């Protein structure tokens, strides 16, 4: 959803003297800082919005039929179904492993690749889900449906990360943070899967050891049971923080 700054601020009830909205990518944080100055505090929420997930036209969920798009910004980049057509079996397997730790990456990559090369269309969420379901037909566990759904969720996550270059964006963002924070400035980052958390944890630790940060989060912060009850999508959330050296 795209709205004008004036409309957004009118809904909030205050203007840009108090709150300024900027529509941009995390990797452009340095450009925002150049315009508005360095920050005392940065809170980065890396999650996909519920509005995007629940919109079948965006293709983020296997639960709803729609185009296999997966772009966070539908006006930029290329949809997932186009990228899938150009991937080798090895490239697809690597994406599934690196982006979602997928245990069935080998057989899934082989079958998805074979389906596409045979001329079958894989352009909708439903078509991809059917391939995943057929690939795992060897599973006879009573919880097979649950296993298939969890696998589908990981596959969609892996493709979304690839389509939007989310890891590359995150690497750029965390590398630029020290340059846009004031001395003593703080940053908190909310991640939603292990790949993101590993990047944040590793970078914060390295920068603390080099003296960039005076302190970093030692133990990841998780939502309480009450928070998860109010918002089930918060279950996978992890938060890490860091304080820039003065």
What are these regions (language model features)?
Residues 1-246:
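S-adenosyl-L-methionine-dependent methyltransferase catalytic core, i.e., the SAM/SAH-binding region
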